[in-house]
């Protein structure tokens, strides 16, 4: 079965993103395909490379990156939601004359078209 996830909660402060990551792990362990994860609203904060959790805390931002690096799961970030919340890649930062960029490697700024494509091509879409 082919899955896609939508994450609307931040990396820290709510349970949504960590539950989504655990669900993603279970999907893959059961032999299913995880096509992509689409981060929307506050969920875009999962792509902020400037997070620095304590050494005894789970680093969810880097865990998402590992999911991409090790399993090839596409990590889409809604570009409009990201820019509103101060998450941007190098290209957008230059285009908008911002001083810096902070998009964690492995994540891609995308439009809602990526979410629509996932809805059309996956058997299940689960929102967290």
Swiss-Prot record:
Gene Ontology terms: cellular component: sulfurtransferase complex
Matches recorded under InterPro entries: DsrEFH-like, Sulphur_relay_DsrE/F-like, Sulphur_relay_TusD/DsrE
One example GO MF annotation: sulfurtransferase activity
Gene3D superfamilies according to UniProt: DsrEFH-like
Superkingdom of the source species: Bacteria
Active site residues per record: 78
EC number assigned by the record: 2.8.1.-
Keywords of this entry: Cytoplasm, Transferase, tRNA processing
Cell location: Cytoplasm
Keyword tRNA processing in annotation: yes
Keyword Cytoplasm (UniProt): yes
Annotated GO biological process: tRNA wobble position uridine thiolation
Subunit architecture: Heterohexamer, formed by a dimer of trimers. The hexameric TusBCD complex contains 2 copies each of TusB, TusC and TusD. The TusBCD complex interacts with TusE.
Biological role: Part of a sulfur-relay system required for 2-thiolation of 5-methylaminomethyl-2-thiouridine (mnm(5)s(2)U) at tRNA wobble positions. Accepts sulfur from TusA and transfers it in turn to TusE.
Family the UniProt entry places it in: Belongs to the DsrE/TusD family.
Protein name: Sulfurtransferase TusD
């Amino acid at each position: 079965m082919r899955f896609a996830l939508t994450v609307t909660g931040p990396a820290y402060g709510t349970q949504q993103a960590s539950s989504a990551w655990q669900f993603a792990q279970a999907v893959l362990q059961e032999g299913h395909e995880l096509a992509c994860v689409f981060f929307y609203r506050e969920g875009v904060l999962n792509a902020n490379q400037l997070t620095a959790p304590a050494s005894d805390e789970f680093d969810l931002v880097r865990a998402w990156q590992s999911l991409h690096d090790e399993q090839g799961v596409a990590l889409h970030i809604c570009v409009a939601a990201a820019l509103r919340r101060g998450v941007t890649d190098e290209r957008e930062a230059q285009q908008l004359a911002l001083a810096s960029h902070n998009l964690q490697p492995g994540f891609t700024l995308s439009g809602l078209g990526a979410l629509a494509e996932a809805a059309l091509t996956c058997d299940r879409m689960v929102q967290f």
